[in-house]
Amino acid sequence: MEKKTVVSVLIAAVIYAVMFVLGSTCGLIHPACYAYAGTVIPLLFGFVYLYTAARWQGFGAAAILNGVVLIIGLIAGEGNLAMVIGLIVLALLAELIRKSNGYDTLTGVRRSFIPLAFSFYAYSAHWWTDTEGSLAAAVAEMPAGYADRMAAVIHNTPMLIIMLVLTVPVAMLGIRLAEKVMKKQAASLK
């Protein structure tokens, strides 16, 4: 592996991590924006993943992306058990799917992106796995009334299910948009 490839993939991973920060800050608008950003953000994730997978045609494209997010999250004190397990499991699923479909194929990238697209939900999962702790943190860190609005979002399980289901077609759209815009990277895959 060339040094230039490693550096470019690490830069892509940092950009991917910045997208997590952008997704989480949209929660300042309303708690639902944070809770469901994981459904929309794959439109952006697709570009970073296609670039990374085209440059890194072997095991590790998804693992590097989620690994950098995990390391930065833990250093920043944002890591929790749900996030750690979620990011690792989703990256491993993506890697297994990509391996079974071919590291150098567009089909492998498309199919493996579906589990990877759920990665922001691994980051925000603490709302559902540690609701009391998340609400307490909201009371301490956010404006008055935020925790009440947040609780309403957390307890709206039907909407969470809908948003999780919608993540799949949004992920498929995100990777297809990336292919249309990033023709060189898409062409480097069979």
Q: Which positions does each model-derived feature cover?
A:
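Short, charged juxtamembrane terminal tails flanking transmembrane helices
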Residues: M1-K3, K180-K190
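Short helix-perturbing small/polar motifs within transmembrane alpha-helices
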Residues: T5-V7, I11-V14, V18, I85-A125, ...
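Membrane-water interface at transmembrane helix exits
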Residues: M19, G23-G27, A53, Q57, ...
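Short alpha-helical transmembrane interface motifs in multi-pass membrane proteins
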Residues: H30-Y34, E78-G79, P158-M159
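Alpha-helical membrane segments and adjacent membrane-interface helices in multi-pass membrane proteins
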Residues: A37-L96
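Membrane-embedded alpha-helical hairpins and interfacial helices in multi-pass inner-membrane proteins
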Residues: V109-K184
